[in-house]
Amino acid sequence: VNLTKGAEMNGKHRIVVIGGGLAGLAAAAYAARAGKRVTVLEKAQAPGGRAATQHRDGFHFNLGPHALYQGGPATSVLAELGVTARGALPPASGYALDGDRLHVLPGGPISMLTTSLLTLAGKVEIARFMLTMRFLDVAALARTSTTDLIAEKVRTPEARRFLAALFRLSTYTDELDRLSAGAAIVQLRRAVEDGVHYLDGGWASLVTGLRAAAVTAGAEILTGAKAEAIERRAGGVAAVRIADGRRLEADRVIIAAAPETARALCPGVPALDAWVDSAVPVLASCLDVALSRLLVPRQRFVLGVDRPLYFSEHATVAKVAPDGGALIHVARYGRAADTEAVEQELEALLERAQPGFRDVLVHRRFLPAMIVAHDLPEAARGGLAARASSEIPGAPGILLAGDWVGPEGMLADASLASARAAARLAVLPLTDRTRLEAAPAPG
């Protein structure tokens, strides 16, 4: 729905959602289902944000590697909203790259016994950690770094490197010295116990499903509509101004956007300023490649052990390529000081896994320093519990949603959990609802 003018714009909109990514669409669907009038403002020409998928010659390109974690807030929100995410679990088999040597990836009992990546002592340590991980107290580990946890739990150098690689894989970050061990354990548990799915059609399937859920419930979605300012009044909000001069009256506003965008829309609020100032973005560089065929079918997954590298072919698991085609994501977790060197490193890994790939290359795309998530759950700040809350102390009527908001999960789990929380608060009257404790500002 793309309304540009007319009577539809003149009435009072109870809830305005700024941002049409996963969090914004989910929040809109929840609020509209509660019977509220909802308008979503998306500055781009189509909703989706970083969950958008580009379609080229039958290939479905996500913005870098995406996997939907099962058993967490994301899957529960999708189920509540009636969104079906079709896909499949990738195999646990693959290879580990340590130095210049490929080893069998220890992804199960047999591969654990046969891999040359780990010594016997290292295999015992990794097996023991995996068996006992479910008993770890994640709350008690909130202020412990993942690096310190690894050092405490395993002793052999190769086991430490491999465990670090598993944490990088499940959290999409290489800053393990800063990452809260509590948050990391939750992610790794979910990956090991519930698994992840590569989605048919890419993540556009989630965007399509959430958009349909919102529109079916009665929400309006305005594309090409950039929110410029929120008009505030005593005790709440009055309206949202759009960059083209339009004005939408509102009782509540949900900002489902990046931290700096939230600050620009809601300036002069100390709690929000503190959250934004302390946010640490999670970055990765990604090389996405479409091939007419897979040259070495057995080498579909490679995990870097001594370097934060990732290689995975998604089309053998999910419907993201034409018949026989291969869609490969190669990534380096972390900040890239030299983007040209990183691109060459990713191409070298691709050549190692699929020698001669250039002969069957259909499309390639390099995304340097892409934002994976807007805030790393830092041990120094107390992990997940220290992230921004949906309610902003000092800004009644304005709520937050996104992967940097709320105490639940990381990545899409955080986006959708915070969307549900923000929508539930947005539909309650300010005067009648039970007052929740305001989250403390970081510091």
Q: Where do the language-model regions lie?
A:
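Glycine-rich FAD pyrophosphate-binding loop
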Residues: 32-56
